[in-house]
């Protein structure tokens, strides 16, 4: 089941509740997915090289790295959301918007019994809890910049205090706390000749909170 908590009215509402004893969905840690994909790649003829891309030549389909330059039949760019290399493809034509918010993410170990997926609508912004297993869940909190800036230097304690108050327990342990600014970015052109942009380089949208 999924519960929604509204801080303004101090109300908890049940959003989804299935009684069939079947899994509604599954969540996987990104780290585990990468490890599994890495093992699968080692069993194939796909060659993975760790290099730093310096530039691309669209006319010759050539990619220049810190070690060499080589031409390819197809070039797929997945370089995150801010790489200047994308300008070669889309000419910096994109739709942008600054949400003036940050996303805070972390993993939490706990001893809470039967905790499910929950979303809390707080004054700072929506916070979502997504369980990995019975003793661990992930947190995604979309928080307004004014609250983020005020608590940047003490982010770990700020987040732990907020979670402890929401979950009515201090017996939680936070790990892998990360944060990044939220923005909208939609590329108008996503391919040119034999080069295509995919992933965050193509579009970045608001995560809401999970």
Spell out what each predicted region is.
Residues 150-210:
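FAD/FMN-dependent oxidoreductases across multiple families
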Residues 3-88, 97-101:
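Conserved N-terminal helical subregion
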């Amino acid at each position: 089941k999924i519960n929604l908590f509204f801080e303004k009215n101090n109300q908890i509402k049940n959003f989804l509740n299935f009684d069939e004893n079947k899994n509604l969905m599954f969540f996987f840690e990104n780290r585990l997915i990468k490890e599994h994909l890495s093992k699968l790649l080692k069993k194939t003829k796909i060659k993975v090289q760790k290099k730093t891309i310096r530039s691309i030549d669209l006319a010759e389909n050539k990619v220049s790295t810190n070690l060499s330059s080589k031409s390819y039949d197809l070039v797929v760019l997945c370089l995150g959301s801010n790489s200047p290399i994308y300008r070669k493809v889309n000419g910096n034509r994109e739709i942008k918007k600054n949400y003036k918010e940050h996303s805070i993410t972390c993993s939490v170990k706990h001893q809470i019994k039967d905790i499910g997926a929950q979303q809390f609508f707080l004054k700072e912004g929506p916070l979502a809890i997504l369980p990995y297993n019975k003793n661990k869940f992930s947190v995604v909190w979309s928080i307004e910049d004014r609250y983020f800036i005020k608590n940047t230097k003490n982010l770990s304690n700020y987040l732990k205090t907020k979670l402890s108050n929401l979950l009515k327990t201090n017996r939680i342990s936070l790990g892998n706390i990360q944060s990044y600014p939220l923005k909208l970015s939609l590329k108008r052109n996503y391919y040119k000749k034999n080069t295509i942009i995919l992933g965050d380089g193509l579009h970045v949208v608001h995560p809401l909170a999970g």
